[in-house]
Amino acid sequence: MSEHTFARASHLSELEAESIHILRETVAEFANPVMLYSIGKDSQVLLHLARKAFHPAPLPFPLLHVDTTWKFRDMYAFRDAFVARHGLRLIIHRNQRALAEGINPFDHGSQKYTHAMKTQALLEALAAHGFDAAFGGARRDEEKSRAKERVFSFRDRHGQWDPRRQRPELWNLFNGRVDAGESMRVFPLSNWTELDVWHYVLRERIPVVPLYFAAERPVIDRGGTLLMVDDERMRLRPGEKPEIRRVRFRTLGCYPLSGAIESSATTVETVIHEMVNARQSERQGRLIDHDEEGSMELKKREGYF
């Protein structure tokens, strides 16, 4: 093993140990935790860490998928197969009122759509099941508002985040005290980077959604963003015509709001090689991050994960 490879392995092991400590600490401090499962690579890594943390026992908490009904078909297929294969407890929650009103990413815009189908749906699910802590796979390197968020992120009785009320976190000490109605969002992957995640996927052979790998897919170019035409609900603007391009996704969300990148990376190793030379943000293709200045922080203040 080369010195560089040994250093990488040691670094990943340190991150793994830290995340497992956070998972166990949360389960010890809270009465009713849950893990948000968005089906992406970070969720897969977090779930893998959780299964390690509590092995050989089953997970001491369920998974929660906030379903907008607009995820990629490959994501739904992967979710159902993975959960069934491993016998996991999965709660699927949808904002039924928003669905009845026909809220969608085309007619209502990304802000209203995200607030209704993601933020409000998440708050509904947490309240309905009485969860006092919710794990998420967010990382500090993803976006500037996440960069300043604590591992234990306190939320008030309305599920909202106030950056000025964050608690100090000294070394590996976490304050999980909450009053009735308050809760905590917990981010065990806070100190990981996108590259760390992919190296860990490679080391642990963690399965991920095929959309992360390059393949011939039907896309349209909308203002410089490549959007995949995943089903018949995709609305084309005048002059738009789907064309087949070799693309993959660095981050996955709702398909009308997730941009692809042209790529030839078909394996984890080639994705890592591509990542080393990347000069653009991982979330550049997430259109919900760009609907206004400070968009992510505003969403998090409202209760978004």
Swiss-Prot record:
Pathway: Sulfur metabolism; hydrogen sulfide biosynthesis; sulfite from sulfate: step 1/3. It catalyses: sulfate + ATP + H(+) = adenosine 5'-phosphosulfate + diphosphate. GO terms for molecular function: ATP binding; sulfate adenylyltransferase (ATP) activity. Coiled coil: none annotated. It is an enzyme of class 2 (transferase). The keyword Transferase applies. Belongs to the PAPS reductase family. CysD subfamily. NCBIfam families: CysD (TIGR02039), PRK05253.1 (NF003587), PRK12563.1 (NF009214). Heterodimer composed of CysD, the smaller subunit, and CysN. This is Sulfate adenylyltransferase subunit 2. It comes from Myxococcus xanthus (strain DK1622). The gene is cysD.
